[in-house]
């Protein structure tokens, strides 16, 4: 496994799984839509989380950012009785060896606004640390000063609806490659709903859809997959000609760091 570090300093690392470098490599063919997406290589988005209620109903996605913390959208409204499922690919299978984690604490961004959907970010501290392995490893977080240009191809993943009127969400994890838009371009579709706390992607025949909320939009930075957006909102009919809107991680990174440091 080229991405595992066998440290020359015994005990310092003990085979760490670095961020943004899944042990099982993703394969992206259609750079297409989750609405028009494709099935992901099983476990290749190793930070992908399924947030589920007590009945096992999947209501939002999320991303593992280290063994103790998951990031998702504030509008997912995670509660202490919800479950965090790691290492899942096929939600209809019981044979995957998933990790079902208990929520320890929930931190919603204090300036989350459900009307403007600004600051749509929430952190979950797991009650016990996740076990990092071939199928479960963290995503890198975009830095405050990172720049991800319009036109850059990035990928979103989730178990969201593959058609807006579908009866049920897909069992198998889906992915879609989407181009980033500049906020100027995005405002051509969404007008003044778009703030600096948001980043847009899509409008090229692909879109994130309901049920993918809270899940990742990742871009490659220096060979590592980096969390650039958190699925936030978009068209109610998941129109592939309208861009999806994501919470902009570069603008929210400082709050993430402060919250993790204090808890």
Curated annotation (Swiss-Prot):
GO terms for cellular component: extracellular region. The keyword Secreted applies. It is found in: Secreted, Extracellular space. Its main location: secreted. It catalyses: Preferential cleavage: Tyr-|-Xaa, Trp-|-Xaa, Phe-|-Xaa, Leu-|-Xaa. Transmembrane segments: none annotated. It holds the Pfam family Trypsin. Keywords: Digestion, Disulfide bond, Hydrolase, Protease, Secreted, Serine protease, Signal, Zymogen. One of its GO terms (biological process) is digestion. Residues 1-18 form the signal peptide. Residues 34-261 form the Peptidase S1 domain. Disulfide bonds join 19-140, 60-76, 154-219, 186-200, 209-238. The active site is at 75 (charge relay system), 120 (charge relay system), 213 (charge relay system). One of its GO terms (molecular function) is serine-type endopeptidase activity. Its EC number is 3.4.21.1. Belongs to the peptidase S1 family. This is Chymotrypsin A. It comes from Gadus morhua (Atlantic cod).
């Amino acid at each position: 496994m080229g991405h595992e570090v066998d440290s020359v300093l015994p005990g310092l690392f003990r085979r760490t799984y670095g961020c943004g470098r899944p042990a099982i490599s993703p394969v992206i063919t259609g750079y297409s839509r989750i609405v028009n997406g494709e099935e992901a290589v099983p476990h290749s988005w190793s930070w992908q989380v399924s947030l589920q209620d007590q009945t096992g109903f999947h209501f939002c996605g999320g991303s593992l950012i280290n063994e103790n913390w998951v990031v998702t959208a504030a509008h997912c409204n995670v509660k202490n009785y919800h479950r965090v499922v790691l290492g899942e690919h096929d939600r209809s299978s019981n044979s995957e060896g998933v990790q079902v984690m208990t929520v320890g604490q929930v931190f919603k961004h204090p300036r989350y606004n459900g009307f403007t959907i600004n600051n749509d970010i929430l952190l979950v501290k797991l009650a016990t640390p996740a076990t990092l392995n071939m199928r479960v490893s963290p995503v890198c977080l975009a830095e405050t000063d990172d720049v991800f240009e319009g036109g850059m191809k990035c990928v979103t993943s989730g178990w969201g609806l593959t058609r807006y009127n579908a009866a049920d969400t897909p069992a198998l994890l889906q992915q879609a490659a989407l181009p980033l838009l500049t906020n100027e371009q995005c405002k051509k579709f969404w007008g003044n709903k778009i703030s600096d706390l948001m980043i847009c992607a899509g409008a090229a025949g692909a879109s994130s859809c309901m049920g993918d909320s809270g899940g990742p939009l990742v871009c490659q930075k220096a060979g590592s997959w980096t969390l650039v957006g958190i699925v936030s909102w978009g068209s109610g009919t998941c129109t592939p000609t309208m861009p999806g809107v994501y919470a902009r991680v570069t603008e929210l990174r400082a709050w993430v760091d402060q919250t993790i440091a204090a808890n």
